[in-house]
């Protein structure tokens, strides 16, 4: 039986791994830069999950548990907090990799609970876990009286179909990291 719970800092390593799966390898390597590896990037992400002032914080994360094993996660936060929460990532990448990511595009804004990262372990896909994580996150959005918003890769129609089936609707085209995306929202 899969349970959805608030994340704990002790789950940071697996949450970081799952977030990196959601980002994809090329994106992670871009953020780490040419002189560093995705293992280096994982160390940074783990440290960001362990913090409370990061967009990737465990405090912003729901996990799917199969027994005690984390098999999925969904990271979300109030879009109004993006710039403040992103500072930990910017400072961390600068310190760890000498990379300046302070000019990143904004993927969200005030007025929505932004679903930053959603991932399910390969061994547990196809069991409705992503749907359960999204439904729990949408309940969080409802409690905050905000629509839930996300960006979906224009090259991932299967993900967009899942979001549409769950009530997410197209808002506008977007770009993130020079990548064409679609901004979707689910109203409260």
PLM-predicted stretches and their roles:
Residues 63, 69-78, 114, 119:
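Conserved beta-strand in the GNAT
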Residues 112-113, 125, 141-153:
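Conserved GNAT acetyl-CoA-binding A-motif
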Residues 78-117:
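Conserved acyl-donor/pantetheine-binding loop and adjacent beta-alpha core of acyl/acetyltransferases
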Residues 126-139, 161-165:
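Conserved acetyl-CoA-binding loop-helix of GNAT-fold acetyltransferases
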Residues 1-10, 28-30:
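Conserved N-terminal entry element of GNAT/NAT acetyltransferase domains
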Residues 26-49, 60, 94-95:
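Conserved GNAT-fold acetyl-CoA-binding loop/helix
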Residues 79-81, 149-152, 164-183:
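Conserved catalytic-core motifs of GNAT/GCN5-like acyltransferases
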Residues 50-63, 80-84, 114:
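A short helix-loop-beta-strand connector motif used in the catalytic cores of GNAT acetyltransferases and
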